[in-house]
Amino acid sequence: MKKFVSMFLAVCALSSMSVNAFAQQADAINVTSDEKLKLSFGEETFSELLLPGETYTYPLYIEQEDGKVVPLTDEHLENVRIRTEMKNGKNAVASFKVEEEDDVYQLEVTTEAGWPTKQTEVEGAVKAVKRSNGQVVGSAEAELTVGYPTISEEALEAAKDGEYIFVEPATPVITTEQFATIDEYADGDKVTFTNGMWRYEVRVSGQEGVNMLYNERAIKETSSKFEDQNFKYVSFPGGPAFDFTGTMTIDVSDEMEDFGGNFYVYRYLRGKLERIDATINSDEETVSFETKNLGRFVLTDKEIADGTIVDESFVSQPETKPESKPEADQDE
C-alpha cells in the first residue's frame, strides 16, 4: 500500500511539473506571437517639427497582457519581425527604419537635407508581421512634419512703421502669404530684412516664399587657396531669389581695421568666384551691392581675378536645377 501511495505521489508531482512547464511555455508564446501585438511610441506625440538634414529617434514600446507598457526588445520578436512602411511625404525623408540600440528597438528617421520653403506632412508606420506567413499582427503610426519654421506674424508688423523685419535663424522661412501681408503693410514700397549684421532692402510685391536661413561659415576652398588674405563670409544656403533687385548691406565694422578699409566682394557659385560691384561706406563701415539673388558672398581685402575657380570638383559636374538643390551652398 505504501509503495502504491509513493508511486501515486510521484506521478502527481510529475504531472504538476508538466503543467507548470506548459504554462510557462504558453506565457512565452503569448508574448512573442500573440495574434495582436500592441505596438506604440509610448507618450510620443510627434509634435516636434523635424528640420531637414537631421536624424531623429523614437523608442518603440509594446503593451503586455497585464497592461504594462515596456520597451520593445528581442524577447518580443521570437516569432515576428518588424518592418516599416512609408505612406506620404517620402520626398522629405532620406531613411525611415527601425534600429536596435542598447537592446531595445526604436524608429530612426533621417530627413532629406535641403532648404525648403514649405513644410511636408509625413505618414509612416512600424508593423509587426509573423515570420511564418507575413500576417500583420501589430502596428504603430507615425505622423511627422518636416521643414523649417516660418517667421512670426509679430515680426512682420515692423513693416507697418517702416522698421526692419528681423529674421531669426530659428525661423528663416517667409511664405508667399506672409509676403502678401508685408507688401500690404508697406503699401507696395520697399521693405528691409535684417539679422543685425546684414540688411536687405527690396520690394516684395507678388513675391513667392523664400528660405532666408543664413550663416557665416567659411568656404574652406577659398580660405586655403588664398591664405595670405582676410575673408568674411555671408551665406544664404537656400539661395532665396527675389523678383525685384534689392540692396544688400553688410556691416564690416569688425573687419575695417584688419582689411585696411579695402573690400572686394564676390559671389561663390559652383566652385567659382564671380566679382560683384560693391560700394564701401567708410563712415557707416558697411559694404553694399545690388542683387536679386541671395547666395554665398565672399568679402576679402585683396583683389581676386573674376571667375577664379577655387573648387575644381565643380568643373566637370552637370548643371543642377536651383529648385532641387540651391547652388548657394552645395559643397557644405
Residue ranges and their predicted role:
Residues 73-103:
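Low-complexity "stalk/linker" and mucin-like segments enriched in Ser/Thr/Pro/Ala/Gly
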Residues 24-84, 164-172:
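Solvent-exposed, low-complexity, repeat-rich "mucin-like" stalks and linkers
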Residues 6, 15-32, 331-332:
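Sec-dependent signal peptide cleavage junction
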